[in-house]
Amino acid sequence: MVDATLASTMKFAILGTGTVGTTIANKLLALGHDVMLGSRTKDNAKALEWHKGSAASGRAHVGTFADAAAFGEVVFNCTLGSATIEALSLAGAGNLEGKVLIDTSNPLDFSKGMPPSLFTSSEDSLGERVQKAFASARVVKAFNTMSAPLMVEPQQLADGQHDAFICGNDAAAKEQVQSLLRSFGWKHIIDLGDITAARATEHYLPLWLRLWGACKTHMFSVHVVRS
Amino acid sequence: MVDATLASTMKFAILGTGTVGTTIANKLLALGHDVMLGSRTKDNAKALEWHKGSAASGRAHVGTFADAAAFGEVVFNCTLGSATIEALSLAGAGNLEGKVLIDTSNPLDFSKGMPPSLFTSSEDSLGERVQKAFASARVVKAFNTMSAPLMVEPQQLADGQHDAFICGNDAAAKEQVQSLLRSFGWKHIIDLGDITAARATEHYLPLWLRLWGACKTHMFSVHVVRS
């Protein structure tokens, strides 16, 4: 059940047609929301395939980045980190104005092979770059520290005893994202502070990648235990 | 109880007289080992204070970095990241040759205020710099992802249901460090691979620092949950 700070059904934009985008899109449809999947072109093959599979819902739509951002009351950035600023520029600052913009991206640089490095320093983050470039959007960094299946079904693992991290400058926007996370099944959500905390969750990615290797599965997550 | 791959009593060098160094030194004394705390000068005030408090054991010693490294069969680097290479140079490559060198340091740069940034990129780590500079030492990165009290008494928190991470190029050295961790009470130890994985655990520090703020205590740690 979606709690009070989120309307029971809302319009969501998902920018990006990869696994993260379609996984979140499907979860939102399952919860009764309307979803537009946005990509660079209207005839993106992955978007059309997703739309075909989701047509029965009557609430699945496809369009350009700009179409989707105009459609959504809340916007998810699910593009690759290296494409994020450009994709959001195509979405259009005007279409993002005043909206909660959930940034799931990571500043991964795959150009030098595996494991990828980060294209940000520890004094910078993609979350901050997004907030700076789209100053009137209410950016919340979230969903960037676990694999796609766990993002939307956290209770699959350890009965949900693991943690989601959020950060952002807008307290009301973070409350909405917390509500959304709870509607996905998240029990443990840690608010790390303002958008500069994106440095922290993005810099966790090198450890996430090594743990992926050590665990031999992407179905793992971390639980913060405290006294 | 220390298991088969570690002798029941051994000689340890601790380089660095801060909280991490003295906390580990006291734990090693409590387990019956001999310990020399090394610092830049023989008359370091913190080292002498520690020695006074530990004299009853008959197994506590102080000396220069070089004295300690010569004394220890296993060497702990517990100096600040910014001082690590210089401290190890003073310890002397010859005194480190063939020895297990446990590197607990983090590449934190406090010069621009709090929170500290990292002075390494995601394609580099202090662990690798140490291994490269002291090629005949058997470097194992460990103990750099939790607060000092938890390093030596992990069962204080959540009955020890949280994780220590190690990495290094020498399998036998990592086995010795795993034995040592178990003798300290660690139940969950994840081997992340070769020394390049130090990039991962060192890059976790920005998240550790934000979690410290969010948890309002340093008595927290992370547990990796997996399917």
Regions found by a protein language model. Name each.
Chain A
Residues 2-51:
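NAD(P)+-binding Rossmann beta1-loop-alpha1 motif at the extreme N-terminus of oxidoreductases
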Residues 54-61, 135-138, 187:
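A short helix-to-beta-strand connector/capping loop
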Residues 55-102, 106-114:
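Rossmann-like NAD(P)-binding element
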Residues 150, 161-227:
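Active-site-lining helix/loop region of Rossmann-like oxidoreductase modules
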Residues 97, 105-156:
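Rossmann-fold NAD(P)-binding glycine/threonine-rich loop
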Residues 23, 27, 133, 180:
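Rossmann-fold NAD(P)-dependent oxidoreductase module
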Residues 80-83, 146-147, 170-171:
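Short beta->alpha connector loops
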